[in-house]
UniProtKB/Swiss-Prot annotation:
The lineage of its organism: Eukaryota, Fungi, Dikarya, Ascomycota, Pezizomycotina. Belongs to the plant acyltransferase family. The keyword Acyltransferase applies. Induction: Expression of the botcinic acid clusters genes BOA1-13 and BOA17 is coregulated by BCG1 during both in vitro and in planta growth. GO terms for molecular function: acyltransferase activity, transferring groups other than amino-acyl groups. Gene3D superfamilies: Chloramphenicol acetyltransferase-like domain. InterPro entries: CAT-like_dom_sf, Plant_Fungal_Acyltransferase, Tri101-like_N. It comes from Botryotinia fuckeliana (strain B05.10). It is an enzyme of class 2 (transferase). This is Acyltransferase BOA11.
Length: 470
């Protein structure tokens, strides 16, 4: 366990530097709270859990700061950062003088509308972005009438969403252990499952990549050049491109656990691919086909192709592999060029599945080596992001175990999870949210309002997906 008597420096990898220095990875956990509960006591236990977690994962309590080298940063954890004071107490109940206009009862009845939970008052992030020292974690306990909204987000520079899932599993375990009634139970649990090994925090395997890698040796740049000769599918949008963010919609849908399995089996049967097609392949293919059909005209005689951007995890494909609980960045956005209107959902699923063969140790080492050779990658971060050029982005959180986390005491399992940050661009996105304890998955679909209306009327979509009206 780390000492709190000296400053600790966490060196960052080229992949860490490639990620945006923003709090794009963020969730709001939502619980009902009895009116008899002492909210100061709940905050105290959350803080104790965070304090213990920072002792085990020191970079979590630190700040991303410049190193003095152009475009280079590190994480600096000061002695005072180990006390859990990153967690902000925010009383938004009636009579607090700072009340939030929505009670827990009302937001639950309205099915926890996504737009409510991106309110600036629920998060300290906006204020943090003006600082030179950016805290790794943004944590705020918002007590509303009858409930708690716990905001937790992290700088993408520090870790990816898989690492964040691992960190929050440890945090929830530590919060649970802080309640007096939970102490004995926690001792009897298999705490080995939550022990932070040194290898989980070791970023050295990702510090150096392949040597002498030029820009056009990297798959994304080669793909960008090849695709520059294709017609842009956005020339065939059914409706004109949106000119205001108000023309976009955050639509919410749900797919049941049973439908997920049936979807995979149905698509697999089209091509006798039962043995290898995954549920995530099938779901991504369905989303690609249906969202494109809702947005892009199918009347053109030309073959239209465009990029689906998905995130793949490098932990298991690296040689040697990283620990599954590695707590840095190893996941990368990965563009896959597909037919905009494939002949079948199976055809799209097959192409998505086969694309993973290109996401391998060499691919990741080439990117690391290329970035490492640049020195200052500030401009390259922008150039690299442009290579993704997505027609659709899928950020799949389905397999994250957020709903399985028991926070103990007055909290227990969260009642709901909602994304903490609003979308602020016009890039269509689908976010399969963490599976609930019954296996059902909410899908957040960010597209033009006109396209969302057509998506709700799509027969193929409606065969598997149910709209959730907030």
């Amino acid at each position: 366990m780390a000492s709190a008597t000296k400053t600790l420096i966490t060196e960052l990898t080229p992949l860490d530097h490639l990620m945006p220095r923003t709090y794009v990875i963020g969730m709001n956990y939502i619980w009902p709270i009895s009116r008899r509960s002492n909210i100061e006591d709940i905050h105290k236990h959350l803080k104790r859990g965070l304090e213990q977690t920072i002792k085990e994962i020191p970079f979590l309590g630190g700040s991303v700061v410049p190193t003095g080298s152009p475009g280079k940063f590190c994480i600096e954890t000061l002695p005072g950062d180990f006390e859990g004071n990153q967690l902000i107490f925010n009383d938004l109940r009636t009579g607090s003088g700072n009340s939030w206009p929505n009670s827990y009862k009302n937001v639950r009845k309205a099915r926890f509308p996504s737009t409510l939970f991106t309110d600036d008052c629920l998060s300290p992030v906006k204020g943090y972005m003006t600082r030179e020292r950016l805290p790794v974690i943004a944590a705020q306990a918002n007590f509303i009438d009858g409930g708690l909204i716990l905001h937790l987000s992290v700088l993408h520079t520090a870790c990816d969403v898989l690492a964040w899932n691992n960190i929050l599993s440890i945090l929830s375990k530590n919060v649970k252990a802080s309640w007096p009634t939970e102490a004995e139970v926690s001792l009897n649990d298999d705490l080995q499952d939550y022990k932070v090994l040194p290898s989980f925090l070791d970023r050295s395997p990702l510090m150096r990549g392949n040597l002498n890698v030029e820009r056009m040796d990297v798959r994304e740049y080669k793909l960008q050049l090849a695709n520059s000769k294709l017609e842009d599918p956005r020339n065939h949008l059914i409706n004109p491109p949106p000119k205001s963010i108000t023309e976009m919609e955050n639509a919410l849908f749900c797919i049941s656990n049973s439908k997920l399995g049936e979807l995979r089996d149905s698509i697999s049967a089209e091509g006798s691919a039962t043995s290898w097609l995954t549920v995530n392949d099938a779901l991504a293919a369905l989303m690609w086909c249906c969202v494109n059909r809702a947005r892009i005209s199918n009347g053109s005689q030309k073959l239209l192709r465009g990029n689906l951007s998905v995130a793949y995890d490098g932990r298991t494909v690296l040689d040697p592999p990283l620990p599954k609980r590695f707590m840095g960045n190893s996941a990368l956005g990965f563009p896959i060029t597909l037919d905009i209107h494939p002949k079948s959902v199976f055809e799209a699923a097959l192409a998505i599945s086969e694309s993973r063969n290109d996401f391998n140790d060499k691919h990741i080492r080439d990117i690391i080596g290329f970035l490492d050779g640049l020195g200052d990658i500030t401009q390259e971060r922008v150039s690299y992001a442009k290579t993704l050029n997505p027609i659709l982005v899928i950020s799949n959180l389905k397999d994250m175990g957020f709903y399985e986390q028991d926070w103990g005491g007055s909290l227990g399992f969260p009642d709901a999870l909602r994304m903490a940050n609003p979308f602020l661009d016009y890039i269509p996105r689908v976010v399969p949210m963490p599976a609930q304890r019954n296996g059902n998955v909410y899908l957040i679909v960010w597209i033009e309002k006109s396209a969302a209306k057509r998506l709700r009327e799509d027969e193929t979509w409606n065969k598997w997906i149910t709209p959730v009206f907030e």
